[in-house]
From Swiss-Prot:
The protein, known as: NAC domain-containing protein 87
Main subcellular location of this protein, as a coarse class: nucleus
Highest classification ranks of the organism: Eukaryota, Viridiplantae, Streptophyta, Embryophyta, Tracheophyta
Subcellular location(s) per record: Nucleus
DNA-binding feature ranges: 119-178
Pfam families: NAM (PF02365)
Keywords carried by this UniProt record: DNA-binding, Nucleus, Transcription, Transcription regulation
PROSITE patterns tied to this protein: NAC
Gene of this entry: NAC087
Amino acid sequence: MAVVVEEGVVLNHGGEELVDLPPGFRFHPTDEEIITCYLKEKVLNSRFTAVAMGEADLNKCEPWDLPKRAKMGEKEFYFFCQRDRKYPTGMRTNRATESGYWKATGKDKEIFKGKGCLVGMKKTLVFYRGRAPKGEKTNWVMHEYRLEGKYSYYNLPKSARDEWVVCRVFHKNNPSTTTQPMTRIPVEDFTRMDSLENIDHLLDFSSLPPLIDPSFMSQTEQPNFKPINPPTYDISSPIQPHHFNSYQSIFNHQVFGSASGSTYNNNNEMIKMEQSLVSVSQETCLSSDVNANMTTTTEVSSGPVMKQEMGMMGMVNGSKSYEDLCDLRGDLWDF
């Protein structure tokens, strides 16, 4: 019995294995190591054995019985297996067992050694209970490794045509059983909101600044503006409009913008102002055409207003002194 160490793996050529791995060590080879260190050696020498790999006939063993036949492993179990052909001259493999069958899934994966050197292929299979096509899928999965490319069987001698493969079998845990179930909270545990008391603080606007200053204007101080169309004037003098513009601004502020009074009084005061201004113009010899225009304006006015205008005209054009005229102008400006 000879014990040989090859590339860090303890191999036993015949007899029982003599090596026991210390605690903490696990047998977890890569895909390339399975092809180059184990399968190739088994194909070249059928008597080749490994400490961590046993031999099994997958057509006569159920997947849940394989862990008992394994030499090593806790979750993954490795075996050397021979393909069972359905027909002597065919390439199809018999994958049925007594209680079910192995079904290939997905695409075969290429296994390379070094830089682009194809050495093998890996096929994934899932075990189904019953018979196809109505089998029941289980969580037992198998990875089947075979030689390909450089290590293909066609490049090996005829004695190696038995087509050995390496199978890795494991039970895939269901994610729903490994994770803790979600705990449901009953509706009664939630705080009930029977009223709007919990959101009163959201409706409190006392902390917000007012949109309008309350002291700016009270209800009694609000003006009652009445739309009044100001009278039009037809004056051809280049100097007279200046005086009318000045007085018109006064009327717009004190007469038309006032909340009290009537339209009749406003028009009456306007005519008095016009007559006084015309008299001043005649005394200063600024314009000789204003009289005619003002006369026309007086004739258009109503009866009561005409009487007041004539009285005003008599007062201005009568035997009044120059001082009285100045006092009249002062009163007009004060108005």
